[in-house]
């Protein structure tokens, strides 16, 4: 049977082991604080709105290797064989690395599974802290200059890219860049951005690798900032950036980046498939199809955020998976499909088992790909 690489994004904020997380979540359990205290905000929401769910596994510390051994086994049992860790660099140092370094990479079963990094190079804003999310303020900027990027690249090369469990395409470690506009803005120009990515390729070769597979996270051209962190702008279009910079492929992070998510999932799906087809014909770069579970980031706010995906249970999610499988079979030699997400609880787009659907989303993946 054909092997598919089903890669779920991981939001590494469910731990209190890094001191800087307490800026946003002072209780010391990471963003579980927001999930656990959901009752605090429900009286502020419109009549009829509810968010009644809890994690079946509990409010676990994902920087604990024993927890991650359990999660790895559950993922593999259901067909998820790659984790894409959101990776952050703020104030000249990494942020939220603990879940990867101390959880996943210290788990006994880590080599059964692959992982790669998505550099989440957006600004860190107050939206992660429900107390101040209504007053969006930048705490740390996500853009970096060339010298800072060299520090980042060397960290990737020495700490991650050479690991046997690091996900590679044609022997090249894959790294994804979330906010290409912020990347270009930090470098100062498209030319400098290109120089930085070429430098990374050269350093990888010096380290004995055949290079790096650099992936762009594709956004829409006229995207609303519904996530609260996606505010970067650039003179190029997204497709022009994809073509002019040495990216090897692209994918998406979330439906919210390119379509109206404030409707039923059944209505969203045709637009998602149309976006895949647009990228198939609009670029020679490989597009890896993306499937999101849904969208509702109301847990992060006292006020009501009206972009809410409705009727997005496991059955209709499975329809999206079948469509992505068909696209991968018909178009790509590498059968990689990205999923949002493993654990984005406060955006209500997660595979984690909960008190509403149990293991329903994972079981949908298993039915399609195993």
Where are these regions (language model features)?
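Glycan-processing catalytic domains of CAZymes
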Residues: 1-370
């Amino acid at each position: 049977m054909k092997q598919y690489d089903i890669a779920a994004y991981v939001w590494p904020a469910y731990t209190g082991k890094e001191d800087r997380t307490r800026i946003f979540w002072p209780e010391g359990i990471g963003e579980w604080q927001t999930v656990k205290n959901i009752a605090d905000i429900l009286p502020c929401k419109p009549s009829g709105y509810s968010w009644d769910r809890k994690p079946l596994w509990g409010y676990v510390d994902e920087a604990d290797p024993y927890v991650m051994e359990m999660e790895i086994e559950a993922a593999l049992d259901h067909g998820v064989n790659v984790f894409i860790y959101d990776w952050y660099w703020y104030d000249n140092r990494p942020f939220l690395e603990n879940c990867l370094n101390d959880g996943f990479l210290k788990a006994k079963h880590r080599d059964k599974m692959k992982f790669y990094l998505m550099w989440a190079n957006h600004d860190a804003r107050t939206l992660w802290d429900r107390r101040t999310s209504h007053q969006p303020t930048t705490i740390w900027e996500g853009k970096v200059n060339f010298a800072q990027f060299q520090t980042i690249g060397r960290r990737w090369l020495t700490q991650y890219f050479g690991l046997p469990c690091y996900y590679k395409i044609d022997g090249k470690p894959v790294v994804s860049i979330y906010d290409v506009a912020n990347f270009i803005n930090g470098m100062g120009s498209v030319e400098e951005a290109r120089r930085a990515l070429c430098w990374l390729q050269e350093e990888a070769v010096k380290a004995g690798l055949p290079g790096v597979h650099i992936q762009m996270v594709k956004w829409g051209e006229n995207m609303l900032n519904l996530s609260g962190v996606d505010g970067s702008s650039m003179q190029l279009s997204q497709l022009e950036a994809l073509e002019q910079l040495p990216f090897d492929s692209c994918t998406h992070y979330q439906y919210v980046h390119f379509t109206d998510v404030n409707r039923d999932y059944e209505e969203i799906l045709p637009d998602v498939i149309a976006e895949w087809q647009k990228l198939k014909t609009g670029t020679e770069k490989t597009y890896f199809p993306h499937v999101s579970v849904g969208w509702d980031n109301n847990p992060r706010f006292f006020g009501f955020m009206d972009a809410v995906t409705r009727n997005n249970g496991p059955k209709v999610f499975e329809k999206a998976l079948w469509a992505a499988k068909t696209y991968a079979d018909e178009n790509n030699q590498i059968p990689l499909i990205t999923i949002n997400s493993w654990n984005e609880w406060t955006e209500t787009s997660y595979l984690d088992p909960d008190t509403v659907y149990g293991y329903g989303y994972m079981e949908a993946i298993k039915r399609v790909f195993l």
